Amino acid sequence: EYSRIFPEILVDHSQKKLSEEKRELSARWSASVIITTSVRFFESLFADKPTDCRKLHNIANSVILFDEAQSLPSDLATATIQAVNTLCEKYRCTMVFSTATQPDYQAIEGARWHPTEIISDSKSLFEKTKRVQIEWRLNINDLHIYRSDFCAIASEMARESNICAVVNLRRHARELFHALANLVRDSGALFLLTTDLCPAHRLEVVREIKRRQRLHEPCIVVATQCIEAGVDLDFDVLYRALAPLEAIIQAAGRCNRNRRQTFGKVVVFEPLDERRAYPGDSYERAAMIVK
């Protein structure tokens, strides 16, 4: 997509095979437009190998856009923001953080984070673009989220024709998928999308889901967080296992995405699991704050 707009563009990430000429250019980022990953970018700033640091002079005086900025690791937030500030103050860079769920970096002590909003009244914009209604499965008496087993969730999902469930663990995704497989007659309508699949296979699955949605064919998807950002799919109903608020919002972005109805439906539930139900301690702490 970018190459149709910019005449000179260099794509540099671990899964991209480069020609000898492009490999030499990528070592120094000698191009007017660079498409890379946040990992590769920060490696160029923090690496202890000279080969990784040869890009710094070309980073200076640049406009740097971080898409889906909320995905930057929270445990490295202090170092990340300090590096960003240094590039702005010492190297005359301009940073743009693009996301629907902007982290509160100002809360980090000593972060020196003073961004300028590009949109003057972002709250009003969010109100105008509201597309979903969120159902929090709460017990009004004690404000605890009902803990749902996957068989019950599968039974509800099987009654829908265009629905997705996003869970926190691959183990949960497999369990829900197998529960649905016993209920859904059309096996071609059922999809599992996790990082157990290689990137090429995930892309193939996404393309098939898009094809079925375009033809208004039944589509029931079980996925992990790999579907939350940058995946252009549109579901009428979306179930989201309890997670940090930004993850719930990102998942909700896959519901009623194209405004085919007034409001889509997002259901937040807590899985019934006696074992560890979250991918990491910081993720679990953030989910408990939401709860």
Where would I find each of the regions flagged by the language model?
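Conserved strand-helix element at the start of the C-terminal RecA-like helicase core
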Residues: 1, 156-181
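Inter-Walker segment of RecA-like/P-loop motor cores
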Residues: 4-46
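Conserved helicase motor
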Residues: 10-22, 39, 168-171, 190-207, ...
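Conserved two-lobed SF2 helicase motor
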Residues: 28-48, 212-228, 240
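Post-DEXD/H (motif II) to motif III coupling segment of the RecA-like Helicase ATP-binding lobe
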Residues: 52-63, 70-125
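Interdomain hinge/linker at the junction between the two RecA-like core domains of SF2 helicases
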Residues: 100-158
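Conserved segment of the helicase C-terminal RecA-like domain
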Residues: 217, 250, 254-290
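A short beta-strand element within the Helicase C-terminal
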Residues: 222-250, 264-269
